[in-house]
């Protein structure tokens, strides 16, 4: 909690800002009121507690997701927003949720195993007991190489797996923890981010023609350069291959699949999907990720030709057919330019090992809080401000893509709808609970002077970094893909990438309250300025239609 004395130190520099030549005029008095409301009367952690403690996790299209969505819609109505509704899209795929699970090692010694099921796994129909078999399957993101390696695997293991729990990874000595798990950007790191000479050129090679990096550390940069059409194709190829593997294991009569995740350490588990969420594809065999230390123990025991027996139970609720999901929408009507819209948003869905607090309950809570601040202050805004809380992000940006396609245009054909001309811009938050340090321009350099001016009142909070760089993996890309201004904020990493991302530690306790309060203030101020700017936000040239890429 910030003291009132520190509050005055935060606010004083705003009134000393010189008028910058060529930059937009700022309503510094209003920004001061926004800061006061965001810090002294914050509700952001209350929003987050409801989303994570009570309604988390929120797997897309699950009953838990819809319960959380109804709560969020109710909170938006309570704040006083207009046109609040759940906007259906789909079909998505199966609804799936885990109601109970346990994994225990019975031999050579008893041990309860810290585990999490992978989504769209089948139930065990009660506890089942069996021996494990070590049949490691190599992992690679290169679809061609993965398919070749699976063909070899199939030939080697056909007829040898029936009635077994298959352990899909070998034993591995954990990497040394040489870096701190919790990190805030230094001034030097922010300067390096800001100094990027240009946004990364996209690699428009076909998926089959891509040259994959040998160094896993280079994969992040490699993925960053993939256009959405290629990334979507890659994602589909990975899911298709996972489905083929699951069919093989089902045909072989395995009892279940066990694995470790290389991201898991110190007792955490990281869990996503076992395969396809489509009802046309079978549910995977009961599939679990086990914390690395326990999994490695089991694998080392098996390497000593010693039997490992486990008892596994998994009860899931899954729909027989594909179902729709929904986005949560609400707005504050504008004034003289009410037909024009400024949007904010965050993905609302989560994975299921934790409660979805930092990914992305934090972003959703901040955006709800932004709307509360603007509504509470009863500020006058020329343009309508609309919030979108998206589902299906974790499975492929499905919810925001569906919304953009329905309202603004189709990224595949670039056939644009009338409302495309009326959306000024979209602002997104989805990188954990770390404080905002600036913004990615997403290659839109015409936005630089606007963001520099809008973020200047937050210089004391060190939130003024502006970089031409792109960032990916979240919902602003759905807007950018049809030529609409879409932006994601730069955030301190904290322990998001090292501990909480898609893990059992993604809980309320890992969220940073003061950082989320500050994020609420920053975004509310930016949105207010965008909503009252004389012109709409500048746009980049329209991208190529995905069909032409």
Predicted region positions:
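Soluble metallo-hydrolase cores and metallopeptidase-like ectodomains found primarily
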Residues: 28-30, 111-114, 123-152, 158, ...
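Short helix-loop-beta-strand segments that form the rim/entrance of peptidase-like active sites
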Residues: 46, 85, 373-398, 421, ...
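Active-site-adjacent substrate-binding region
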Residues: 216-234, 238, 246, 250, ...
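Metal-dependent peptidase/peptidase-like ectodomains
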Residues: 110-112, 123-132, 140-152, 159-165, ...
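Noncatalytic luminal/extracellular "stalk/propeptide" segments of secretory-pathway proteins
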Residues: 23-27, 49, 53-220
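Bacterial N-terminal signal peptides that target proteins for export
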Residues: 1-11
